Amino acid sequence: MNIRPLHDRVIVKRSEVESKSAGGIVLTGSAAEQSSRGEVLAVGNGRILENGSVQPLDVKVGDIVIFNEGYGVKKEKIDGEEVLILSESDLMAVVS
């Protein structure tokens, strides 16, 4: 994938969600939730602070993150894959 996010932006590929319920029923449409987890594909250089210095991001390529898909999250298709472009502040946790 040939994309480089700017500043404190992160490119995330959403993880696939299990499309079956606990009882084995296949879920479709709105019953099948979208995952709020994904893999970090690319990170920007960092957040620019008031004094002009750059604070590096806490996440790195390959991290599995839990994110808040709220205002400011941009969905894009890059090389045929849907990815999310979001700010590091939209990330809630790194799964280890």
Swiss-Prot record:
One Gene Ontology CC term in the entry: cytoplasm
CDD domains: cpn10 (cd00320)
One BP term from GO: chaperone cofactor-dependent protein refolding
Superkingdom as given in the UniProt entry: Bacteria
InterPro entries: Chaperonin_GroES (IPR020818), Chaperonin_GroES_sf (IPR037124), Chaprnonin_Cpn10_CS (IPR018369), GroES-like_sf (IPR011032)
Keywords for the protein's UniProt record, in alphabetical order: Chaperone, Cytoplasm
Cell compartments where the protein resides: Cytoplasm
GO molecular function ontology, one term from the record: protein-folding chaperone binding
Role description: Together with the chaperonin GroEL, plays an essential role in assisting protein folding. The GroEL-GroES system forms a nano-cage that allows encapsulation of the non-native substrate proteins and provides a physical environment optimized to promote and accelerate protein folding. GroES binds to the apical surface of the GroEL ring, thereby capping the opening of the GroEL channel.
Subunit structure as annotated in this protein's UniProt entry: Heptamer of 7 subunits arranged in a ring. Interacts with the chaperonin GroEL.
UniProt family annotation: Belongs to the GroES chaperonin family.
NCBIfam families from the UniProt entry: PRK00364.1-1, PRK00364.1-2, PRK00364.2-2
Name used for this protein in its record: Co-chaperonin GroES
Organism ancestry: Bacteria, Pseudomonadati, Pseudomonadota, Gammaproteobacteria, Alteromonadales
Protein encoded by which gene: groES
